[in-house]
């Protein structure tokens, strides 16, 4: 990982079998869209998210039925589970009792001190962290009265207020988010938060929109934040299938060199020289490599003259021409293949290289 694009001196916090912060890799999160009390549907969606590359998943816990479902859900999934709690501290206690890995609350809206203390004590006993979720759209009244409207300073003040509540109870396994739907506000809030405290930061642009618009908005905002070395976990919030959130998050992290085990596709824009159906081929290959957990780079290019040289960093690739294609590795042509079989030949080569990479990774783990 490139240290230039990684926030250092961040307090490490355990979430299930993962460690957030410190010098650990940035983690991708998402949230289910199912009713949490529907265990079968929720587990099915979580498994889809996990297959797509989600590393932590959050579920809404609006009532007792949802809280009671936590234990059954936990038994059937492999990634850490987070409970999203508002107002009722008893739901947090039930979720903790059910084996939840992290609780997302705002201590200030849980109620009197004894209620917050009950949640903190239960979390402390189980070694469960608490995420303080600051949102520009739901800042406390006294902060809005002080600043007049949601500001980055107001959001940081809110975060510090909630942090102090937990610290006064000798609780320090804290993660903080500073979400806003306004991109510039979110960027400023995260920058100021990173200077104000050393707890891990969960990144997000809230209510960013539909698949297309939300992807652009999230990439603009979160990309600016990531470029400053800020962020320890991340969720892309979209009005879409949550699997799409994970796909966008993976691509965003790959763009900054922050996803060590993810396949990357290199493909050229179309032009008048192209003799193959580049767009459909690129989409097919992208889908094929989307679940690979190795850092393979694959190229799909339309020009057999310049293609291999332009994608010399690719582990494997094809460059199309009329009726045939060039299969190349690291910029050097391996062989010519007929157009009708070049995608299948590329997939075979991808499988071989991916298997080699996975084997090497396993050997490195055993040697450590």
Swiss-Prot record:
Query: How would you classify this enzyme at the top EC level?
Result: oxidoreductase
According to its UniProt record, which cofactors does this protein need?
Answer: [4Fe-4S] cluster
Determine the domain of life of the protein's source.
Bacteria
Q: Which UniProt keywords apply?
A: 4Fe-4S, Iron, Iron-sulfur, Isoprene biosynthesis, Metal-binding, Oxidoreductase
UniProt-listed SUPFAM superfamilies = Dihydropteroate synthetase-like, Nitrite and sulphite reductase 4Fe-4S domain-like
Q: Does the keyword Protease apply?
A: no
EC identifiers of the protein: 1.17.7.3
Q: Please give the Gene3D superfamilies that the UniProt record associates with this protein.
A: Dihydropteroate synthase-like (3.20.20.20), Sulfite Reductase Hemoprotein, domain 1 (3.30.413.10)
What InterPro entries does this protein's entry cite? Answer: Dihydropteroate_synth-like_sf, IspG_bac, IspG_bac-typ, NO2/SO3_Rdtase_4Fe4S_sf
The UniProt record gives the binding positions of [4Fe-4S] cluster as: 268, 271, 303, 310
User: Molecular function (GO) terms listed?
Assistant: 4 iron, 4 sulfur cluster binding; 4-hydroxy-3-methylbut-2-en-1-yl diphosphate synthase activity (ferredoxin); 4-hydroxy-3-methylbut-2-enyl-diphosphate synthase activity (flavodoxin); iron ion binding
PANTHER family in the cross-refs: 4-HYDROXY-3-METHYLBUT-2-EN-1-YL DIPHOSPHATE SYNTHASE (PTHR30454), 4-HYDROXY-3-METHYLBUT-2-EN-1-YL DIPHOSPHATE SYNTHASE (FERREDOXIN), CHLOROPLASTIC (PTHR30454:SF0)
User: What is this protein identified as?
Assistant: 4-hydroxy-3-methylbut-2-en-1-yl diphosphate synthase (flavodoxin)
Q: Which species is this UniProt entry from?
A: Bacillus cytotoxicus (strain DSM 22905 / CIP 110041 / 391-98 / NVH 391-98)
